[in-house]
Amino acid sequence: MSSRIDRDVINALIAGHFADPFSVLGMHQTQAGLEVRALLPDATDVWVIEPKTGRKVGKLECLDARGFFCGVLPRRKNFFRYQLAVTWHGQQNLIDDPYRFGPLIQEMDAWLLSEGTHLRPYETLGAHADTMDGVTGTRFSVWAPNARRVSVVGQFNYWDGRRHPMRLRKESGIWELFIPGAHNGQLYKFELLDANGNLRIKADPYAFEAQMRPETASMICGLPEKVTPSEERQKANQFDAPISIYEVHLGSWRRHTDNNFWLSYRELADQLVPYAKWMGFTHLELLPVNEHPFDGSWGYQPTGLYAPTRRFGTRDDFRYFINAAHAAGLNVILDWVPGHFPSDEFSLAEFDGTHLYEHSDPREGYHQDWNTLIYNYGRREVSNYLVGNALYWMERFGIDALRVDAVASMIYRDYSRKEGEWIPNEFGGRENLEAIEFLRNTNRIIGEQVPGAVSMAEESTDFAGVTRPPETGGLGFWFKWNLGWMHDTLDYMKLDPVYRQYHHDKLTFGMLYNHTENFVLPLSHDEVVHGKKSILDRMPGDAWQKFANLRAYYGWMWAFPGKKLLFMGNEFAQGREWNHDASLDWHLLEGGDNWHHGVQRLVRDLNHTYRHHKALHELDFDAYGFEWLVVDDNERSVLIFVRRDKAGNEIIVASNFTPVPRHDYRFGINQPGRWREILNTDSMHYHGSNTGNGGVVHSDEIESHGRQHSLNLTLPPLATIWLMREGE
């Protein structure tokens, strides 16, 4: 005889409106004795089984035809391990009862999660294969403090929200449940009765794998093993290291020619990685690989921050790709988007019926430029979710650096907003103080937890101290994209050479602020889309002049202080804009040797020469590493400077940005002796006119530009040359 269960409780449980299933289901000590209760829709017969002997201990009575069973076990007083023999559609199945297991999340973890100080929340939240009390299965947990009820639905329960309602840990707002038999590879979601009584089906914010779009389910997947960064990888990120970044969109670098389908992670490991190594790049930067529903977002509107996109393969395939890059001596940078997320119903938006991850006021929580939602960084659990994600990619995949997207949109409340469309901070200012603190905290934790890992900021304003320590008012990034340099130099290069003399300062201005931050010089994906034209097509003149201008510009860029970044396709001067739905124009490199081969060879030589000579990279962020030799010859559009290493070795860089060769061009130098031309962008090897200095030039004891010794050079048309001192 079972104890009396309130009919309203049974109805609420079956209807999915009951918040505390563990208070009813499972094994309970009652006045009637030891009682077992189970909600098993469509079952016709249920027995309690003792696992050791397989003996039937007692039969459960069907109290409701919709699947509620209950029974008192005779001669049993103490709790024990049990299983249920359940008959469905005439077939008996032996199952473990999810409601016989105790709380899953340890009190310390729950406290840290609530405080927002759990360094690795992904180790607790989400779906994790586990063995409990000798039973294999998966433990699920999700943060949804305002939901009235949360269930796990998936392939293991016919996507039926009645079958696996979860336990609420009220102190943290986390719902949890261990489901015996649920295993890796199975799909799942969370079904929530939200704060307003509406039903929502949500993907797991902490899912390690997800379905291929347009499907949106999460996939049970084990946590990857930790990756220990090698000493070589750590050194490759240092300020004095040569850093030349090849920025890549994995879906359009190259495609299968027969069906225009993407290459897989493993195919990219076999093709992209050796190509980048051959080209001499030191780093691969990947446009976001987090799962995202819309191809046209390029990954910048992610819905699965913890899941590599299935477009190119599995999570393990992605790890294979990263391992291949590391084996080839390439560090991997991941574009990371902690600034906003899309409003898709299956994702984070109004997760539990409230504005849980985003701000409730659209003046704070809605990004009108991208039709996305903005994270509420002031909510500890939200910041914890994001900080944990940064560590996840670095520790579990071996990502060497994160490039943080759209930092300006995060740190300014009035970003892209008119007056009246934004809310000031507590001091009446425009800064988003919570976002600033989040970025500082993220960078601090990266520095403490992942030796050698770094972060880079795409920050488009003049916010002071992006790469300075937080204790001095900075954001704590290691590097910042120099978007000002990029805009100024491209504006200069697109001018007809006749008019460049009037805009000389666009090339010199960058040095006035160059040492305020640790800069990366970016020619990124943003510069070859939306009608901006390709980098090649921005160059003025006929075809010969376009290619000559581009080569001269690359020679200038690779010698200028700052780390280098080049988006794919620019290394061989693709003529059209980037199209994310198609392969790069590799056909331009087919057939006989041409101008595109010339640019490709130049970029390869730039990379290898840049890496070989410390003067070109060792003191990028030290004033001693750079000195103007000729800065004011605007009439002839000539600029000459010195790069210097710690030992004082110099490389001279001279650029002529007109199509007129400058013969007998004399300028003063610091170190007399024999100088060799080690790179000339006008060389015949790059399909230039082959004007130059015949290899070696000797200095003269003739005063020039305030220096006792000087060189007399021929400066090729629309070209940059590099010279290295060989001796006295």
UniProtKB/Swiss-Prot annotation:
SUPFAM superfamilies: (Trans)glycosidases, E set domains, Glycosyl hydrolase domain. Keywords: Carbohydrate metabolism, Glycogen biosynthesis, Glycogen metabolism, Glycosyltransferase, Transferase. One of its GO terms (molecular function) is cation binding. SMART domains: Aamy. It catalyses: Transfers a segment of a (1->4)-alpha-D-glucan chain to a primary hydroxy group in a similar glucan chain. Its EC number is 2.4.1.18. HAMAP family: GlgB. Monomer. Belongs to the glycosyl hydrolase 13 family. GlgB subfamily. This is 1,4-alpha-glucan branching enzyme GlgB. The lineage of its organism: Bacteria, Pseudomonadati, Pseudomonadota, Gammaproteobacteria, Enterobacterales.
